[in-house]
């Protein structure tokens, strides 16, 4: 693996030196590939365009990120920003690279979660768009263009993760391929109109299974906090190592989102049928609400309190998008019945 890691560092160095003018593009691409962007940015937009596809986006995002966490616990995987210093191989001639605010994620590196979740979620969206365009226009060229744009977007997300030193190239490729396979598989079973008990059990199963697996690995002598220690040691700025990028934060986000999805469908099973203009208003209000929810600060001590509140925070997201905001807009725009 050492040779693979060396080549990855050289590629990151070359990418930073030769595309410095594209730094803003890479940072935006990395942000758009963040698993939480699938929940906070992509889900509302898709949901107000097509309800079932929006639910599929949330479902696939949660399950693919959870599986990514399990894979990382099994495969470990270094990250470039800490491996450069930890390996001791570059003491004489360190690579000319820099870290960024989004570099210092504290979980293991393989496979890339950004690549895996993004490729899974956007497969659901692009394949749905391609099916729609094929049905209404009969144009295979348009479908091909959509899949080409999908590939270009994934390429940008993957390169951005290498550029900011968050992942090695082989970790990105592994994440992209695994994500596409998950997108194809999970799209077949979208839990629309499933009972609340289904989501409650699924949410608790994700939490329970991950915690049991974590405990078993620790019992065998595997220290799963190794990556957090390395992140704190080698990140160039300590404030860039945040609890919301830790593995247990991902776990609680996924479980919270699924429980919230169940609650949203329980409160209003069929949702509201709104015309295009009210749906646009819903999107604007939801985006504003989710912006403030995502930025709401949580106490980081004790950790159990942080993770519990993090779970609740993301369980609110589907309810805001699917129930609270559409219900409010429905009340505002509904025409009074004539007697």
Swiss-Prot record:
Keyword match Hydrolase: yes
Entry keyword Transferase: no
Positions annotated as active site in the UniProt record: 114 (proton donor), 167 (nucleophile)
UniProt xrefs under Pfam families: PAP2
Membrane-side (Cytoplasmic) residue stretches: 48-54, 133-143, 187-195, 330-339
SMART domains: acidPPc
Binding site for substrate: 79, 161
E.C. no: 3.1.3.9
Gene Ontology annotations of biological process type: gluconeogenesis; glucose 6-phosphate metabolic process; hematopoietic progenitor cell differentiation
SUPFAM superfamilies: Acid phosphatase/Vanadium-dependent haloperoxidase
Keywords (A to Z) from UniProt: Endoplasmic reticulum, Gluconeogenesis, Hydrolase, Membrane, Transmembrane, Transmembrane helix
Metabolic or biological pathway, per its Swiss-Prot or TrEMBL entry: Carbohydrate biosynthesis; gluconeogenesis
A GO MF term: glucose-6-phosphatase activity
Gene Ontology CC entries for this record: endoplasmic reticulum membrane; membrane
Main location: endoplasmic reticulum
Membrane topology: Multi-pass membrane protein
Gene3D superfamilies: Phosphatidic acid phosphatase type 2/haloperoxidase
Record localization: Endoplasmic reticulum membrane
Catalytic activity: D-glucose 6-phosphate + H2O = D-glucose + phosphate
Family: Belongs to the glucose-6-phosphatase family.
Function: Hydrolyzes glucose-6-phosphate to glucose in the endoplasmic reticulum. May be responsible for glucose production through glycogenolysis and gluconeogenesis.
Record's protein name: Glucose-6-phosphatase 3
Name of the encoding gene: g6pc3
